[in-house]
A protein has these predicted regions:
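Active-site hotspot residues in diverse enzymes, especially metal/ion-binding acidic/histidine motifs
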Residues: 1-169
Length: 169
């Protein structure tokens, strides 16, 4: 599935097929007004569900949110650690141990930590960073926007020049 995310062609349909083959129900909902929810997951009657929202139409956000929810399914729900598996917005804590684990799972699934350790160490300006990391992503067969999304997530720098290839394919 990670390869399909990096290829970013017919991405939503491909992801749905891959998840269905694993017994995971998947759907995409339009953006939820006044809610900053990119996705959620739960298990009902033994069936895992992943729902993503169209909060952003960007492959980096889609890929991270998807793998974050896959992380919840495999790390927290299927191992029996959680049985309720319901999202409660008032109780939601982005800094909880489970959220941190799902974030780490997603980051490592999309760009393995061993690979990430060898990424360019450029921190000059957004244009230089974008150029160097795009070149590195191309050399590694990774989607440049997923790579730049990780840079944004880790550094808080979001000033990269966007183009049509950032949209979900």
């Amino acid at each position: 599935m990670v390869r399909a995310l990096h290829d970013n062609r017919s991405t939503e349909n491909t992801v749905k097929e891959i998840l269905a083959a694993e017994g995971i129900a998947f759907c995409i909902e339009e953006k939820v007004d006044k809610a900053s929810v990119d996705g959620y997951s739960y298990i009902e009657d033994g069936i895992p569900y992943i729902i993503l929202t169209r909060r952003y139409d960007r492959i980096d956000n889609f890929a991270f949110a998807l793998m974050h929810e896959v992380g919840h399914i495999y790390l927290h729900y299927l191992d029996g650690r959680r049985s309720d598996c319901k999202l409660s917005i008032p109780d939601y804590d982005n800094e909880s141990a489970e959220e941190k684990e799902a974030n780490a799972f997603a980051a490592n699934a999309l760009i393995p930590n061993e690979e990430w350790k060898n990424a360019p160490k450029v921190r000059l300006n957004p244009a230089m960073i974008q150029r160097k990391y795009t070149q590195w992503a191309n050399e590694k067969g990774l989607n440049k926007w997923i790579v730049l999304g990780r840079i944004s997530y880790e550094t808080g720098m979001y000033k990269f020049r966007s183009d049509e290839s950032r949209r979900i394919g």
